[in-house]
């Protein structure tokens, strides 16, 4: 998790606070090669405002026309906040780590809280928001799961991909 946390904070530090650009630092979007972290993601780049990304998600959905009429774009934020908000990014990374390694969830939480506490890149307010989200292993909310399913954007685990020896 540390390498992903570091990369996420570097990303947040490099963008201008007035720039609305998304980043999805979930664990499964990374690989480690020769001690370096490599980012890969097949989702379209989030070089857009969150509202525009919400519209794109609906447009890509097989039910986009119907969903656009019944789901306010702001509700899609339940999915896309994790691409734009530092606290939600942390929660997403930690939640992903805990879901992939449930037996280590307590260790992951302890490490994550210590990382946040020691970070000089995070403001006091950032830390408070993150600590509120890391009281227990983060879980995906039912609304998050529903919106992802309805938009056809459920994600596929890539940990079962065969590795040639």
For each predicted feature, which ranges?
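Conserved kinase catalytic-core helix
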Residues: 1-24
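Context-gated lysine
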Residues: 2, 14, 49, 59, ...
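Detector for Asparagine
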Residues: 16, 29, 54, 77, ...
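Alpha-helix capping and helix-coil boundary motifs
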Residues: 17, 51-52, 101-104
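Catalytic activation segment of kinase domains across protein kinase-like and atypical kinase folds
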Residues: 19-80
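Regulatory N- and C-terminal appendages and interdomain linkers associated
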Residues: 37, 93, 98-165
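A conserved mid-domain beta-alpha-beta active-site/ligand-binding segment of alpha/beta enzyme cores
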Residues: 62-114
């Amino acid at each position: 998790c540390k390498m992903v946390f570091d990369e996420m904070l570097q990303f947040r530090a490099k963008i201008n606070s007035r720039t609305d650009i998304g980043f999805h630092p979930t664990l499964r979007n990374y690989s480690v090669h020769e001690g370096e972290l490599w980012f890969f993601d097949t989702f379209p780049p989030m070089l857009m405002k969150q509202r525009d990304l919400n519209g794109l998600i609906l447009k890509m959905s097989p039910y986009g026309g119907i969903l656009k009429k019944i789901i306010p774009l702001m509700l899609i934020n339940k999915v896309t906040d994790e691409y734009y908000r530092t606290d939600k990014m942390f929660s997403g990374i930690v939640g992903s780590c805990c879901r992939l390694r449930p037996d280590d969830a307590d260790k992951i939480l302890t490490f994550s809280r210590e990382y946040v506490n020691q970070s000089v890149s995070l403001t006091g307010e950032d830390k408070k928001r993150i600590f509120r989200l890391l009281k227990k292993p983060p879980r995906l909310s039912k609304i998050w799961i529903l919106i992802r399913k309805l938009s056809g954007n459920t994600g596929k685990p890539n940990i079962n991909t065969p590795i040639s020896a």
